[in-house]
Amino acid sequence: MSNPGTRRNGSSIKIRLTVLCAKNLAKKDFFRLPDPFAKIVVDGSGQCHSTDTVKNTLDPKWNQHYDLYVGKTDSITISVWNHKKIHKKQGAGFLGCVRLLSNAISRLKDTGYQRLDLCKLNPSDTDAVRGQIVVSLQTRDRIGTGGSVVDCRGLLENEGTVYEDSGPGRPLSCFMEEPAPYTDSTGAAAGGGNCRFVESPSQDQRLQAQRLRNPDVRGSLQTPQNRPHGHQSPELPEGYEQRTTVQGQVYFLHTQTGVSTWHDPRIPSPSGTIPGGDAAFLYEFLLQGHTSEPRDLNSVNCDELGPLPPGWEVRSTVSGRIYFVDHNNRTTQFTDPRLHHIMNHQCQLKEPSQPLPLPSEGSLEDEELPAQRYERDLVQKLKVLRHELSLQQPQAGHCRIEVSREEIFEESYRQIMKMRPKDLKKRLMVKFRGEEGLDYGGVAREWLYLLCHEMLNPYYGLFQYSTDNIYMLQINPDSSINPDHLSYFHFVGRIMGLAVFHGHYINGGFTVPFYKQLLGKPIQLSDLESVDPELHKSLVWILENDITPVLDHTFCVEHNAFGRILQHELKPNGRNVPVTEENKKEYVRLYVNWRFMRGIEAQFLALQKGFNELIPQHLLKPFDQKELELIIGGLDKIDLNDWKSNTRLKHCVADSNIVRWFWQAVETFDEERRARLLQFVTGSTRVPLQGFKALQGSTGAAGPRLFTIHLIDANTDNLPKAHTCFNRIDIPPYESYEKLYEKLLTAVEETCGFAVE
């Protein structure tokens, strides 16, 4: 819908308003997502436009532009509405609005994209409003130059907020909110509306705010005395080009690295802004706790970055913009893959092995232990990973999987392998055949739990235990007994990637070297200790002692395959090369590599291919093998105290008999039975890295959902019921502890299946 209104001459100017997207809109219906559209009104001029409607999303993307004629006293109101509800009653379907006064319009135009917070129509409105809208204002008397290709992937990370509260401990923002009366274009006060007003400060105020935020840049900022007069813009830094998209949107390209950004490099980046769309910037930004000196791309020398990784190629578009082709995964990107080494270096600086500076003042309670800092940094890196993966998830469609419990392995294999990787990234919806459960996360968790129990079972021959008394999984070198074993390993890799992508966990523990191989890191002798202690002890003895009069080995080792003793040469003609004091280090190194890669090269590459189809390899660079193990498998140890302290009670209190008896029963359970209880209620035996306070509930929920004990009014002959999507267990008011224990045990051990109430 569009109403251009009347074109006014004289003092009015033509402005192109681009409405790019909205983010984190309020979800007001539990079972339905809104159909958002944006409405743009130039107050007092009769100009009115509406964007297209985007179906079923809280993060709509429009990328539509409108040419507006704005006078000196005009203001622009942008409101977001739910198309499903606008016809029900007056004001229904309102999701938030923002109003730009004339002063703000003049300040914001030609500054690229800005993210504005949505607010209520009236302060007295009870409906929740949250989220942001990303827009840009551009005068139409400019002529754009350069190419028309632009990388839009980094737009949602551009935290160019127009206003920001400056609470205690927070830096000042370059733009500040200033209360103003609600006036129409004539200046008369108007009633009924209370949209957020945006009033830009003067240049002097912005300079002062920048000085307060970062004293180190005082000398680099222009003062009002030496500032250029008029609207003449300073020159761009060396290596930058200003270009314009087909829709008239201005962006900036760093020609040496091929990185594009909506942020003007001539303007100091406000606190909270992530310059550009490079993932390395995002990692550095979040890991440093939102402290923000913008990264100078001029300091990046392409020669110092070295050659491209294997399988990568540099190409350029018709307009001359450089992009990079990954032939390994058949993908393209504008970001130089060599910049991820910089990101990895920044993350390595956070390792706890480095000494931590002590605070100059404050109590001992304020000091941070290395373990605490390490955990905090790991949580931050995990948040960044989740954010990067969420950007890759399609907004529409579902990844629907329907299997039977009896044939869960084969049916899952057939359905997963016929899907494309981009289909697996859609919202996961799992259904067990013959059951009516709706999957809001709990059914998918149970599906993964049951599938892993089958898929990783050594009975199928894909995996084996590392030793007879250490039950850690490794790839079975004799898996080729199954002619389709490589396809099954590809499937296993996809399942692991699917779990990580959708925030679930794999119920199975692999060896530490397996995770190092997934990260592409070399395996060392120390990695052997947790897998094969006896062999590790023997190889360490060889290194630490003189073997000349003791050992009579060659560079040839024996191994058992299907009852036959086979020999393997660690190097060419190894059977004729004796192990001596001079070459024993080479022998140990080759032996360790052979021990972990013996006959599993093809299997591992197939598994890694499936995993990287959903989790790109460069996103794993900041993590080590222990962290990757936590990302894939979560915590397998259940902390009962953490469980108790992060449990929500519904229709009961901590002193209720039901609650006391429940925890009394849990305390009598062994580790295995506690894990079964947790799986019964949440769908998974694994706990998130942050503990029980981070238990995930329904898919798409804004935050975690705590474990919940719900006392219900039901017949005490009934068994407890679990709602895995909400991490809730419903318990009838049993008369005694013995009855609760019996019913709880029966429900956990003897029942399965989903239904809809």
Swiss-Prot record:
Residues 193-237 are annotated as: Disordered. Changing K381R: Abolishes FBXL15-mediated ubiquitination and degradation. Abolishes FBXL15-mediated ubiquitination and degradation. It is found in: Cytoplasm; Cell membrane. GO terms for cellular component: axon; cytoplasm; cytosol; extracellular exosome; neuronal cell body; nucleoplasm; plasma membrane. Residues 420-757 form the HECT domain. Keywords: Cell membrane, Cytoplasm, Differentiation, Isopeptide bond, Membrane, Phosphoprotein, Repeat, Transferase, Ubl conjugation, Ubl conjugation pathway. InterPro entries: C2_dom, C2_domain_sf, E3_ub_ligase_SMURF1, E3_ubiq-protein_ligase, HECT_dom, Hect_E3_ubiquitin_ligase, WW_dom, WW_dom_sf. SMART domains: C2, HECTc, WW. One of its GO terms (biological process) is proteasome-mediated ubiquitin-dependent protein catabolic process. The keyword 4Fe-4S does not apply. Its EC number is 2.3.2.26. The C2 domain mediates membrane localization and substrate selection. This is E3 ubiquitin-protein ligase SMURF1. It comes from Homo sapiens. The gene is SMURF1.
